[in-house]
């Protein structure tokens, strides 16, 4: 679809140069032949790692292959006048101490917290005096109960207990996010000193156990059972269950009936922003503004960040130790350590010389589950969507539900399961699960006056299509048209409001952002690929078989979701190792 219509006659405008960009014109921006540490990839985790290392006095350089930093946490004006969070689009899971330590607000980070945060309209006939029903959830528990009681009074009474139950589990899991997993290798094969040091890695696990106490078996079930089972035990109304279940399958090639889907839900409710547990926000200026703030913090301390500098190979010396990188243009940069924010597959199967990696390790990396159900569609529109269940106010000003994650085709968990079954057969879902967000409802800087940016996070779309088909432009547009038809049923007039769109299928997400298989987490967040086993068993502490080479991206513990924890944790592991060299 060609760009056109109101607001699109504006030429691409240049925003003020971020602090980190200005820093590159200074002394610390010139490429040097040697650094203490080199970071491959300027995704948010790589930037966090660089910022922490630089704070600790480790001279660090970051090399990014694209023209823009942030990895998947990026803002791009791909349609003139419209700024899109092109891949990741919401913030919640970023560790609070990262915001504090790196002084991100000082470096320009501004958040728009959403309250209410979830809106699920029903696809049903209204009457003269009654609109189609909808489920609107926010931080006001009394208001939530009133909304839920439309569907079940019993569920309205049970909902506060469910929220408290999940909150306690989040508090227990929280300490596990901020440290490397238990060092089982040291316990098994380390020296006495190494074993004593490894005892400290048990503390987060012990703390989690104490927090859960006698309820540990119930919480174990939440982590291992299908989310449908967990929700069926507590609720009876499908709109509530399906709305909650979306957090258990988002970004995952799983159904609500898949064992272990409960953990993915937990992963998406464990965030905390500005002291509010479970809060989700839009970032002023898009997700790239978060990456700019982290980069600014790192650059202010002296880190060097380079764009359009692709790392072609990790250099390994004759003793099997990483000693720098070779760039695509042939330039060599030496360093004492190398951190990779790239996925495990790119890091170990493409960049690291294979002769230095054990065959069993390479095999495990190549077998990681990276299935992705996600197609992201970024849309420029010339008016707000007008939902039948919540008609727009006069003047077309954003209302509370417009700032929410708007869940479409999510009235019943059976709809989610059927959408999953379509994709398992190699077909895009006939009724895809759609999470529609309108960040410009809270941040008008993202679009021309009167216009809006719409983010459509949709699933399920398989990476490989049945019948030998490929994701060409025709297939992509056919699927996008299907998504738009679904939205039109809830919000008539949506299709007429569309000015332009950007369609990113799993192969596109892999090609542009190097997300393996298009997986937004760098690999499935299933129980067999978490904690001790992320990315693979025996190598969950950010180290790998090549000494001096570390993994610091979402493929490492604790996983994806614009959390920053992997970058922060890896930086501390690297710093300890540097002190012992």
From Swiss-Prot:
Binding positions (FAD): 38-71
Give one GO term, molecular function aspect. oxidoreductase activity
Q: Which residues form a coiled coil?
A: none
Q: Name one GO cellular component term.
A: mitochondrial matrix
Q: Name one Pfam family in it.
A: Amino_oxidase
The superkingdom of the source organism is Eukaryota
Give the chief site where it resides. Answer: mitochondrion
The record's EC number reads 1.-.-.-
Family annotation (InterPro entries):
Amino_oxidase (IPR002937), FAD/NAD-bd_sf (IPR036188)
Q: Which UniProt keywords apply?
A: FAD, Flavoprotein, Mitochondrion, Oxidoreductase
Q: Which family does it belong to?
A: Belongs to the carotenoid/retinoid oxidoreductase family.
State its role: Probable oxidoreductase that may play a role as regulator of mitochondrial function.
State the PANTHER family in the record: PHYTOENE DEHYDROGENASE (PTHR10668), PYRIDINE NUCLEOTIDE-DISULFIDE OXIDOREDUCTASE DOMAIN-CONTAINING PROTEIN 2 (PTHR10668:SF103)
Q: Tell me what this protein is called.
A: Pyridine nucleotide-disulfide oxidoreductase domain-containing protein 2
Species source reads: Mus musculus
> Lineage of this protein's species?
Eukaryota, Metazoa, Chordata, Craniata, Vertebrata
